[in-house]
């Protein structure tokens, strides 16, 4: 890529863990296999949205490493390049990803991999904010975190000593951005899938990836006995 071409693109990074290492809070409702199947479906959805945005290279940042067969499938089917998240807490890994991306492109967007409502247009709206001169763009999550962060510059203050996984992540990130005197935009809030009650909001096509067809028999756990469906109709 030439220098002029690099200036026109925004890298989109998707953070994901290997199936079986994510969405463990859904196991009581879905079973181990069901939770892994839903996780795969959500990751593919987010990578596909990144690809369809046509903003620039799509990078799948993988944990614990890039060797899981599912990640290799994403690379083969969707054209995402694979990158190891590496060591450290979530903030350290995000900072590392942004430093890598912004060394190659003037703008970068990072999203999670459990966002059913993520769309190519949402990503394009994020990049539009950065192209018009914002230093940061945030896609809030309904639970007090965020589903997306986009940057045109990187500062470690955004990522260090953040209470990741708590309800104050977004508020603390806003404070950090204000302290840096950065210009920032917030997009409409989206929801992510963390708890069994979130399953009720999934589109039907995503439910089909991990739930049996509606046959009146109900969901069953891995021993074949009926299990609680976590409120799903």
Annotate the PLM regions.
Residues 1-26:
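N-terminal nucleotide-binding beta1-loop-alpha1 segment
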Residues 5, 168-233:
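Conserved alpha/beta core of the MobA/IspD/sugar-nucleotide pyrophosphorylase nucleotidyltransferase superfamily
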Residues 26-34:
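Short glycine-enriched, charge-decorated loop/helix-capping segments at active-site entrances
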Residues 39-56:
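A short, N-terminal amphipathic alpha-helix
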Residues 56-80:
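Acidic donor-binding segment of Leloir-type glycosyltransferases
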Residues 71-107, 166-169:
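Short phosphate-binding loop-to-helix
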Residues 111:
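Catalytic metal- and UDP-sugar-binding loop of GT-A-like glycosyltransferases, i.e.
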Residues 118-143:
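Conserved donor-nucleotide/metal-binding helix-loop-beta segment in metal-dependent transferases, i.e.
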């Amino acid at each position: 890529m030439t220098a002029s071409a690099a200036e026109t693109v925004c890298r989109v990074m998707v953070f994901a863990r290997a199936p079986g290492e994510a969405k463990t809070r859904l196991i009581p409702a879905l079973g181990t296999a069901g939770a892994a199947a839903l996780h795969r479906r959500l990751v593919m959805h987010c990578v596909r949205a990144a690809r369809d945005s046509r903003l620039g290279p799509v990078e799948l940042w993988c944990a614990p490493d890039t060797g899981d067969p599912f990640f290799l499938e994403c690379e083969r089917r969707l054209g995402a390049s694979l990158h190891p998240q590496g060591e450290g807490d979530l903030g350290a890994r995000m900072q590392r990803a942004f430093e890598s991306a912004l060394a190659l492109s003037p703008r970068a967007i990072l999203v999670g991999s459990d966002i059913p409502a993520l769309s190519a247009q949402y990503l394009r709206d994020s990049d539009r904010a950065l192209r018009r001169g914002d230093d940061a763009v945030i896609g809030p999550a309904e639970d007090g975190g965020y589903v997306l962060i986009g940057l045109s510059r990187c500062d470690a203050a955004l990522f260090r000593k953040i209470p990741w996984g708590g309800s104050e992540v977004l508020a603390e990130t806003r404070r950090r951005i204000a302290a840096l005197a950065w210009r920032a935009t917030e997009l409409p809030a989206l929801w992510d899938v963390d708890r069994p009650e979130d399953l009720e909001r999934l589109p039907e096509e995503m439910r089909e990836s991990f739930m049996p067809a509606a046959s009146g028999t109900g969901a069953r756990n891995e021993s074949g006995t009926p299990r609680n469906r976590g409120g799903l109709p």
